[in-house]
C-alpha cells in the first residue's frame, strides 16, 4: 500500500531549499487542514486549489505528484 502523499512529502522537507517540492512540504507541514491521509490526486489537488491558506504553482504540483508516484 502506498503511503499518503503528505507522508512522502514530509520526507522532502528542507527549509533551506528553493526547490518547489521542499517549499510545498514546508507549506503543508504548517497547514493544519492539509489532507494528511490521502493518496488521491483529486483530493490533494482540489485542496490546493480551493482550501489551502497558501498559494502554490499547480504545474509544479503536477510534477511533484509524478515524483510521488515514481518513488
From Swiss-Prot:
SUPFAM superfamilies: YozE-like. This is UPF0346 protein SAG1509. Gene3D superfamilies: YozE SAM-like (1.10.150.260). NCBIfam families: PRK13672.1 (NF010193). InterPro entries: UPF0346, YozE_SAM-like, YozE_SAM-like_sf. Belongs to the UPF0346 family.
Amino acid at each position: 500500500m502506498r503511503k499518503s502523499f503528505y507522508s512522502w512529502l514530509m520526507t522532502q522537507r528542507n527549509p533551506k531549499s528553493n526547490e518547489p517540492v521542499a517549499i510545498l512540504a514546508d507549506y503543508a507541514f504548517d497547514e493544519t487542514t492539509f489532507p494528511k491521509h490521502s493518496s488521491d490526486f483529486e483530493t490533494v489537488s482540489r485542496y490546493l486549489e480551493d482550501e489551502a491558506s497558501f498559494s502554490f504553482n499547480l504545474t509544479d504540483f503536477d510534477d511533484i505528484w509524478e515524483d510521488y508516484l515514481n518513488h
